[in-house]
């Protein structure tokens, strides 16, 4: 049994906990503690009730500093300094670092100094971590000695498996990406101040361009793709599910049927459970609560002049990513067992 703690109990932190209870992995992973600065009453309430993912199927209660989920008891902590967290006392194997504020090795090593054995970051990190993992593509790089690991981003997890499949079959020469991302909690409900002037504007009223480092994230996972991709991102007035418009130029000449066939086979084969494929006329809300990293919409595949391919990919940017956090943490422990 892996003993884990969640540091930061926001959208991803809560999704990790809920995903664990729905995924069938509770015999392998135990959430021992949650460190969150919000009030315990709010933590309990938002665990039970969620606008995006619905009501939690398990009963959630508070008992002092314990969050009770069914027969499970999880210690609630309220410690802003990661160096002072009781990870040694609690014998924590892995900390899910989900605050969004600890993004480099030095900051995350506070958890190691506090007694945790490993840290898995739930967002892109600086380059000095031991590895950045997209589960299903490069989790075989995990080693027993690794202590600080990034699980990349939801969009990196969405797009990299598709690029990997296309490259192995048809050789990707270059690509351009537009991420059509649901609104996030770093945006405003109504106009308010923000360092990013575009994010001063009401999230529910505009399509808002934001900066993205997705292209650099692809390079970190697939180093041979360096300088081959560029990306832009816009936020749209939906609360969950993201679409990615991917255009790639391929070395080999292809048609729509070949592209869709290769991706569909991958979804049923080596990427089963990670990559999906659909040819139904679906919309974004149909992918809410989907545990896969990426779903190819085969109805939107286009090929121009035999080499330029356009794809539409879907992902639940919360739920799919939370499930990959669970998968990667199990792979981290397996790497130790394989030592």
Curated annotation (Swiss-Prot):
GO terms for cellular component: cytoplasm. It catalyses: D-erythrose 4-phosphate + NAD(+) + H2O = 4-phospho-D-erythronate + NADH + 2 H(+). Coiled coil: none annotated. PROSITE patterns: GAPDH. GO terms for molecular function: erythrose-4-phosphate dehydrogenase activity; NAD binding. The active site is at 154 (nucleophile). Signal peptide: none annotated. The record marks 181 as: Activates thiol group during catalysis. Keywords: Cytoplasm, NAD, Oxidoreductase, Pyridoxine biosynthesis. GO terms for biological process: pyridoxal phosphate biosynthetic process; pyridoxine biosynthetic process. Homotetramer. Catalyzes the NAD-dependent conversion of D-erythrose 4-phosphate to 4-phosphoerythronate. Belongs to the glyceraldehyde-3-phosphate dehydrogenase family. Epd subfamily. HAMAP family: E4P_dehydrog. This is D-erythrose-4-phosphate dehydrogenase. It comes from Shewanella frigidimarina (strain NCIMB 400). The gene is epd.
């Amino acid at each position: 049994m892996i003993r884990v703690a969640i540091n930061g109990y926001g959208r991803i932190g809560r999704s990790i906990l809920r995903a664990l209870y729905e995924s069938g992995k509770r015999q392998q992973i135990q959430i021992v503690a949650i460190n969150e600065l919000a009030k315990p009453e709010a933590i309990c309430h938002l665990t039970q009730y969620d606008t995006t993912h619905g009501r939690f199927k398990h009963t959630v209660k508070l008992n002092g500093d314990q969050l009770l989920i069914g027969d499970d008891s999880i210690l609630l902590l309220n410690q802003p300094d990661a160096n002072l967290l009781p990870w040694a006392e609690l014998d924590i194997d892995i900390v899910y670092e989900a605050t969004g504020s600890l993004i480099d090795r030095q900051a995350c090593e506070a958890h190691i100094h506090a007694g945790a054995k490993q840290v898995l970051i739930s967002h892109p990190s600086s380059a000095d971590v031991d590895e950045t993992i997209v589960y299903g593509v490069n989790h075989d790089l995990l080693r027993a000695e690794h202590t600080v690991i990034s699980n990349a981003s939801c969009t990196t997890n969405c797009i990299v498996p598709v690029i990997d499949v296309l490259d192995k079959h048809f050789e990707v020469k270059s690509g351009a990406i537009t991420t059509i991302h649901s609104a996030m909690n770093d945006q405003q409900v109504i106009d308010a101040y923000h360092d990013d002037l575009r994010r001063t504007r009401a999230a529910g009223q505009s399509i808002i361009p934001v900066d993205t480092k997705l292209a650099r994230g692809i390079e970190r996972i697939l180093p041979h793709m360096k300088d081959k991709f560029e990306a832009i991102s816009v936020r749209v007035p939906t609360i969950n599910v993201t679409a990615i418009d991917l255009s790639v130029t391929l070395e080999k000449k292809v048609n729509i049927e070949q592209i869709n066939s290769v991706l569909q086979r991958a979804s049923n084969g080596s990427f089963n459970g990670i990559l999906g494929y659909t040819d139904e006329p679906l919309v974004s809300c149909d992918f809410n609560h989907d545990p896969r990293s990426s779903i190819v919409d085969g109805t939107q595949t286009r090929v121009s002049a035999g080499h330029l391919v356009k794809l539409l990919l879907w992902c639940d940017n919360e739920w799919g990513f939370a499930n990959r956090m669970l998968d990667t943490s199990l792979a981290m422990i397996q790497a130790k067992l394989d030592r």
